Design a protein with these regions (language model features):
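Membrane-embedded alpha-helical bundles that constitute the cytochrome b-like, heme-associated redox core
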Residues: 1-154
Length: 154
């Protein structure tokens, strides 16, 4: 009986240097702009004529949205070059599935945050969105650490 495998599945799913740099820059930018938006939204509010807001809050959200578009593109790149080949090797499978699930939730919840009209629902989705988003670097680092601890062929 033969198993079905993707072409080149035995080669592993290592991400090349330039795409890896793109993943790191986009991921760091996305996380940093989201964290800065949270900081300015919740902790650095100033009383203004529109209520308690910080003038930079909207800019951090705009930058976060721009990085989110880049992240969607980057995820598409990784899907074909890393996720699918990695699926066949079964290496770091759990952390990889968790990362894909987290990214999927972040994309879905971002869509909901943009289009949900009910403020109570938006608040719940917002808290879940930034909770998952803030934890993503830990999961990413765990996935990377396992890659270094168990290089291909060992």
């Amino acid at each position: 009986m033969t198993s079905r495998r993707a072409p080149g599945a035995n080669a592993g799913a290592r991400v090349a240097t330039v795409p890896r740099l793109v993943v790191h820059v986009v991921g760091a930018g996305l996380w940093l702009t989201g964290a800065l938006w949270l900081l300015f939204h919740y902790l650095l509010k100033r009383q203004g004529w529109l209520g308690a807001v910080h003038p930079l809050e909207s800019w951090w959200l705009r930058f976060h949205g721009a990085f989110a578009f880049a992240a969607i593109w980057t995820f598409g790149l990784l899907w074909g070059t890393h996720v699918v080949p990695g699926w066949w090797t079964r290496r770091r499978f759990r952390s990889g599935i968790a990362l894909v699930a987290f990214v999927g939730w972040l994309m879905l919840s971002a869509y909901l945050l943009y289009y949900l009209g009910d403020e109570d629902q938006r608040f719940v989705v917002s808290v879940l969105h930034w909770s998952v988003g803030l934890s993503c670097p830990l999961l990413f680092l765990a996935h990377r650490w396992r890659a270094r601890a168990h290089p291909p062929g060992h």
